[in-house]
Amino acid sequence: MQRRSFLRRTGLALGAGAVLPSLSFTSPSNVSLDSWANVRSQFLLDPKRIHMAQMFLASHPKPVRDAIDHHRKMFDESPVEYWEHNWKTMEPEMCKAAANYIQADPTEVALTDSTTMGLGLLYTGFQLKEGDDILSTTHDHYATDKSLEYAAAKNKATIRRVTLYKEASNATADEMVGTLTKAIQPNTKLVAVTWVHSVSGMKLPIRTIADAIKSINSNRSDQDRIYFCVDGVHGFGVEDVTMADLGCDFFAASTHKWIFGPRGTGILWGRKDAWNKVVPTIPAFSYPAYGMWLGMIPQGKLNFCDLHSPGGFHSFENRWALKEAFDFHMQIGKKKVADRTHQLGSMLKEGLRGVNHIKLHTPVSTELSSGINCFEVEGMTSEEAIKKLSTKKIIGSAAPYPISYARLTPSIINNEEEVKMCIAALEKIKE
């Protein structure tokens, strides 16, 4: 189908003589990211503050800012022309960049606005029947809990939540995997977990869980197969792993946290042999999906990207700048990002362990922790501790859970001196 024929059918064809704006944004390639100081220089973060909560909502590095500014300018100059010239190619380019980052097929990646949107689309669209069992945990975020509740109510399924550990700091991988797999029942069709618990900093051994579920599935028919779904947001952008490494069936994450991507962006990845388990909730506006509806493309099976990226008009200047965030990470190197994040996190945890009035809840081992570090200050609530730190220009966060711990999350924008200043401030926080 020709693009102009498609646009005539949608009421958006322009005059034959229209001069269309520049097709795309080209990010400068001469920026050196060979030192952590150079990496930090790419951000407009206030240097008078120590930013230890980028995992909540990140600042944009220069390549992402420049791309957003470019797209915004072009939309403001001629919105319809710029959209017409780019709409068919830009979202597939973003999926391609995400797929390159996770070493997956671009057709397996759908674009979302957030982890919450991804989880909502996944779980409420998951094909369950009355009596099916959903197994989850007591450590998941509100977004997972509510999405699963809506899915259960919609399908008359049941939900069970198991506690994998009482205290994260001394939990073991064997204990957690054993507890979860022992809770699987014959009618369990969906296992939903969170990779890194933002309430405690615990990082689950996703691959080990995936292998255990695969073993159980080997004795089941396809109809009774268990599907393994992961809220991966707080490992995504930290850990040097691929989707093949994790071994799950579905993976949801936002890209405006550890990825430092445009605000209001995210991905939902689905393994090819699991696509048919999820029914779309929001119609896609992809070129193939819309073209089939118009009768201008032969009917056929749509891939996950084309079918499950929600349609409608988005904040295009942000969505179309997502590639630059993934490119930024890849230019630094995924392993370097992972090593640096763990280095600073380990330094912080070791320092906090030596403070008498601090209780560290996050495991010290990097096998069971990622970039989130959760702790309590004796005699203070998490909000009080974070507020006190803010008087020292240290920006942290309080975990938004019924039981809340204070959190400091150093990332690649931080340095050793800032970590030392955080430890020193916490040593004196009760004075």
Model-identified regions with their sequence ranges:
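Pyridoxal 5′-phosphate
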Residues: S5-E431
